[in-house]
A protein has these predicted regions:
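Low-complexity, compositionally biased segments
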Residues: 5, 119, 134, 213, ...
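Intrinsically disordered, polybasic Lys/Arg-rich low-complexity tracts
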Residues: 271-328
Length: 328
């Protein structure tokens, strides 16, 4: 499972992933019997409501999946899946299942990222540029346990100063040219001229410049996956190296390098027990019964007083009878 799960944005370069899938699809179409490591490409993301190009890229991924997944010449060796409504619950299922973690943003554009850390902790091997937290992952696991490709930040800045011309890269790479023209011609009956035009004329995030190196990294990842023992070791190295992203390590760095404070040993005292908090014995429970009895007696007192009051009301009648006898 080759997984790219994150917010959809041009700088995160889902379009670069799509170009590689198209190139592999065209290669298999031309030679259906060639040796090829089967791979399922999984996308999961959301686009901002007003981000037109991001929504078009989602539409392109969906259209491409219908073409590739239903082509009998491919024989299921490439599958493209787009998971809708990406959220934490979906990530909880996708990240443990991932074999390859696509972290392919243009160098110098990603602040850090945390998805790459979660995938690393779940044993996925990072395939990415030296951007954001990929740099720390690379430092933690070493060259042999990660697939790094693409321009570095100083090289990106230098190319921007000189003036980046995407058409130059396109016409110097026949595979890339064919993939871009595939998009330009429309996919599954839908037009994607906006995407192909942007790639050929602007390509702000240099997907075409990194395409050839990205393809090499994809081939290396396929070779590594075929060696099950090697791939398992790479996965374990990523899991064991993920400790650098723990909150404990981060807070310790703050304490040492920014706050300049020393750790304080905190000795937790056992909670003091009191008689009130201790469980009551049978003898302690007896007074409680007496108190309830008194309450019952007090409630019964008003009823007795009510009975005594009844003869007092009858007294005037007796005096009335006596007066009648005297009058006779």
């Amino acid at each position: 499972f080759d997984v790219q799960v994150k917010r959809l944005h041009e700088y995160k370069r889902q379009q670069l992933n799509v170009l590689n899938i198209i190139a592999e699809y065209q290669m298999l179409k031309a030679n259906p019997n060639m040796e090829f490591q089967p791979r399922t490409y999984i996308f999961a993301s959301k686009a901002a409501p007003g981000y037109f190009m991001a929504k078009k890229i989602i539409e392109l991924i969906d259209a491409l999946s219908k073409v590739v997944n239903n082509d009998p010449d491919i024989k299921g060796r490439i599958k493209v899946v787009f998971m809708e409504d990406y959220n934490v619950s979906l990530a909880e299922m996708l990240m443990p299942a991932a074999d390859i973690s696509e972290q392919i943003s243009l160098a110098g554009t990603e602040a850090s990222g945390t998805g790459n850390m979660k995938l690393m902790l779940n044993g996925a091997i990072t395939l990415g540029t030296l951007d954001g937290a990929n740099v720390e992952i690379h430092d933690a696991v070493g060259d042999d346990n990660i697939f790094i490709f693409g321009l570095k930040t100083p090289e990106v800045m230098e190319l921007q100063k000189k003036g980046y011309n995407p058409m130059e890269y396109m016409y110097n790479n026949e595979t890339l040219k064919s993939a871009v023209e595939f998009i330009q011609a429309g996919v599954n009956g839908k037009s994607f001229g906006e995407i192909s035009s942007s790639l050929m004329n602007v390509d702000q995030y240099m997907a075409l410049a990194d395409f050839a190196d990205y393809q090499k990294a994809q081939k290396l990842s396929a070779q590594a996956y075929q060696d099950k023992e090697r791939f398992a070791k790479m996965s374990l190295m990523n899991i064991s190296g993920a400790g650098i992203f723990s909150a404990d390590r981060s807070i310790m760095d703050y304490a040492n390098n920014i706050w300049h404070t020393q750790p304080v040993k905190f000795k937790e005292e056992a909670p003091k027990t009191s008689k009130k908090s201790a469980p009551m014995t049978k003898e302690e429970k007896k007074p409680a019964k007496k108190s309830t009895a008194k309450k019952v007696e007090k409630k019964a007192e008003p009823k007795k007083e009510a009975k005594k009051e009844t003869p007092k009301k009858a007294e005037p009648k007796k005096s009335a009878k006596k007066t009648t006898k005297k009058s006779k």
